[in-house]
């Protein structure tokens, strides 16, 4: 009986010691994730280069990003090769999560945009004149108005 009490006491002592480890180990990945989310959120909202920012502001985009209203048949993320190349040509880095339009054309307030195309408010539209690309950058969906 005495041996059983010692075994139970020893088991309780070991089991409480095993669960009493500091919680700092799982806390480190959580803090790392929170820091990365904060950094990502801050870069998503960074402004485009002043030299390339559109001067043609649309009333429909005034509350979104002060951009121009465009209609684009395709959209691509900022990490796609065509977008990365265009950004590098003009000496800036674009966030990989940004929305960018390809094959875009300017539309004016209340103008029609075909159902299968994307209505975007874009802050950089100077690259829309490029012959093969017609790229609009730093965009937000106009539906978010």
Curated annotation (Swiss-Prot):
Signal peptide: 1-20
Disulfide bridges in this chain: 61-121, 71-113, 72-104, 122-139
Keywords from the named record: Cell wall, Disulfide bond, Glycoprotein, Secreted, Signal
Predominant location: secreted
Disruption phenotype: Does not seem to affect germination and growth, formation of sclerotia, ability to penetrate and infect host tissue, nor spore and mycelium surface properties.
Cellular localisation: Secreted; Secreted, Cell wall
Glycosylation: residue positions: 36
Protein's job: Aerial growth, conidiation, and dispersal of filamentous fungi in the environment rely upon a capability of their secreting small amphipathic proteins called hydrophobins (HPBs) with low sequence identity. Class I can self-assemble into an outermost layer of rodlet bundles on aerial cell surfaces, conferring cellular hydrophobicity that supports fungal growth, development and dispersal; whereas Class II form highly ordered films at water-air interfaces through intermolecular interactions but contribute nothing to the rodlet structure.
Protein name per its UniProtKB record: Hydrophobin-like protein 1
Gene name linked to the record: Bhl1
